[in-house]
Each structure stands twice: as structure tokens, then as C-alpha cells.
Amino acid sequence: MGDLEIRRATAADLPAVVAMLADDPLGAQRESPQDLTPYRAALERLDADANQHLVVAVREGRVIGTLQLTLIPGLSHRGATRALIEAVRIHAEERGSGLGGRLIEWAIDTSRSLGCQMVQLTSDKSRTDAHRFYERLGFIASHEGFKLKL
């Protein structure tokens, strides 16, 4: 097994990233890997925002994982900056290899180095395996989340 590189995602990575986003029952309903146009536009917006970090994990030239880290400056908690981890995906062949833990470790270390005081994430209620994974990494299910589609 070769060395792992975690780096900023590029347009060339989009087919692999979107394929991972679509590779589960929830993602299959909302993602469109056959049309990368909206994803290219989204990547341009992410790249233009210094608080956005879309990264990929690459081994032997192959994208095998991804996540998005968003920094959120705020007033609460004495003006704390939070980091939000989203869209954590691991290629099906790499699940159970420890890669997810390494990506989350990268996100925590990066958040700390950028001055964040807290890292948070949400996970769909149906992803009970993911919930256990995050709890093993020290995350606490402390809040109930709500969404409103616009």
C-alpha cells in the first residue's frame, strides 16, 4: 500500500469525488455523476472562499476519499471559530481501512492550526454506522439538527 496524500481537490478530481458522493442509497437519490457541470461551478465557488477546504485523499494516483471542511467565524462561545466537517466519503474498496479516521484526524488538526475552538459535524439519522465511527473518534451527539430545503 502506497503513501497517502491529503490535498486540496481539483477539477480533475471531480469525477471520483462525485462518484463517491453518489455511492450510497442517500447519495444515489441526490447526486448526478453523469453531469459534472453543477459540481464544477460549486468547486469554483469553494476555491474562491478561503474558509472552504474541499480535500481528497489520494493513494498511488487514485482518489480514495474526500471531505469538506468549512470554517465558521462566530460570536457565541466568546467569538469562537468553528469548523464544520461535511461530505465525508471513502471509496467502497477502502472502507474499514482506517482512511476515514485519517481524514477526520487531518480535519481536526487543520482546524486547530487555523485557530478553531470546536469541530462539529452532522450525519443523517439513518447512518448509524457513521454515528458509531464519530463517537469512537470522540465526537458527542449533543444536538438535534434541522434542515429546510429551499
Predicted regions and their residues:
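Acetyl-CoA-dependent GNAT
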Residues: 8-12, 19-80, 86, 104-105, ...
